[in-house]
Each structure stands twice: as structure tokens, then as C-alpha cells.
Design a protein with these regions (language model features):
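Alpha-helical transmembrane segments and their membrane-interface boundaries
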Residues: 2-13, 17-147, 160, 164
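Hydrophobic alpha-helical segments
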Residues: 133-208, 213-217
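Conserved small/polar residues in nucleotide/adenosyl-binding loops
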Residues: 221-223
Length: 223
């Protein structure tokens, strides 16, 4: 009897250890702070829009010159993921107004991004597709895995008490929302429909699965 009780106690201790080890609510910020962070990141006015256009131009140059370092720099400053998290927040909190506002805002960001990239590639003297451009035209299952993992990590980073964490920059690089849109601009500028469809499909995959992962994590945090 004592032996059985000892086993049950050990099991309970293990459950407690694992629960604490993988808890996402233990060091979470308050709901008010989470809301403020996510909605601020999803704004399409002021600083966010200026930064987005700069990021698009930087990413376009990087893709056009086949420079991985420049592309990474553009992904680090891109605000696109903020809009996806804001849409997800509106979904989980059952706020139709937030969902609509940030969905429209995200669509505007996409249009401006593609238009900016198209103008750049129309003016660029380099017309040949680089390795980095072509890499954004063939989405596969691994892109889905990256987007899901990135969405989970991204929302966890946004909901921590400590804002000064290194999660968001890493997620921005991993999920790569900006380069596919720039590739769409290249495809439009050069009349390449197949490349346009492939690049936009990759962008949709990334955005959708980041959204799904964010929904799941926000639900678990009980926003």
C-alpha cells in the first residue's frame, strides 16, 4: 500500500515539474498589457508604415543583389507580423471590430508592400532572377512547420512580462513574411505569372499558419 502511494506521489511530482516547465501562463503579462502590445504592433499608421516601406525597399535590394544579410536585416524590422497577431487577438477575444479593422489594415500593408516592390524592380537595372528570389517561389511542407512554430514563439514572446526578449526578432527571420511579397513585386514588374503565384502562395501559407498558431496560444493563455 505504501509502495503504491509512493509511486502515485512520484507521478504527481513529475506532472507538477512538467507542468511548470512548459507553463506559458506563469510569467505572462496582464491581459491589458498584452492587448496594448499586440494592438500597437498591428497599427498601420505612423512609424509602422514608414518602417514597413523601408523594410520592403531593403528586402527588395537584398533579393535583387542576392544578399542574405540584407534580406535578414529587412525581416528584422518588418512590422507585418504585428498585424497578423492583432487579427488573431480580435478572433480569440471575439471582437469583430478589431478583426475587421486589422484585416483591412493587413490587406493595405500587403498592397503597399507589393506596389513598393514592383516600383523598385521596374526601376532596377538588374532583371535576372537571383537565387534568393527563386527560393521564394516553391513553398513546401517545411514552410508550414516553420510558420506554425514561428507563430507559437511569436505570440509567446509578445505575452511575456519581460518585453526585452530575443524571441520576436528570431521569429521575424524564421517566418519571412517580407521576402515573398517583394518577390511578388519582382514577378509583376517582369510579367512572370508563375513566380507571382508561387511567391504569393508562400506568403499566404506563412501568414495563415502564424495566425492559426497565434489563435491557439492566445486561447491557452485565456485572453
Amino acid at each position: 500500500m505504501k509502495h503504491r502511494e509512493g509511486i502515485e506521489k512520484e507521478r504527481e511530482n513529475l506532472r507538477t515539474v512538467f507542468k511548470k516547465m512548459f507553463s506559458i501562463t506563469e510569467d505572462a503579462a496582464s491581459n491589458e498589457e498584452i492587448r496594448d502590445r499586440i494592438l500597437t504592433g498591428g497599427k498601420i499608421t505612423g512609424t509602422n508604415m514608414v518602417v514597413m516601406i523601408c523594410a520592403i525597399l531593403i528586402a527588395s535590394v537584398g533579393l535583387n543583389t542576392n544578399s542574405v544579410a540584407v534580406i535578414i536585416g529587412a525581416m528584422l524590422i518588418s512590422p507585418l507580423m504585428g498585424s497578423i497577431l492583432a487579427i488573431s487577438y480580435g478572433t480569440v477575444s471575439n471582437d469583430a471590430y478589431l478583426m475587421k479593422r486589422h484585416s483591412v489594415g493587413f490587406a493595405v500593408q500587403i498592397l503597399i508592400s507589393v506596389a513598393t516592390a514592383t516600383i523598385y524592380f521596374l526601376l532596377s537595372p538588374i532583371k535576372e532572377p537571383t537565387e534568393q528570389l527563386l527560393a521564394r517561389t516553391n513553398p513546401n511542407f517545411f514552410d508550414v512547420m516553420i510558420a506554425l512554430a514561428g507563430g507559437i514563439a511569436g505570440i509567446v514572446g509578445q505575452t511575456r512580462q519581460d518585453k526585452a526578449n530575443n524571441i520576436i526578432p528570431g521569429v521575424a527571420i524564421a517566418t519571412a513574411l517580407m521576402p515573398p511579397l517583394c518577390t511578388c513585386g519582382y514577378a509583376i514588374a517582369n510579367g512572370n505569372l508563375r513566380m507571382l503565384l508561387g511567391a504569393f502562395y508562400l506568403f499566404i501559407i506563412n501568414a495563415y499558419f502564424i495566425y492559426i498558431a497565434s489563435d491557439l496560444m492566445l486561447s491557452l493563455i485565456h485572453i
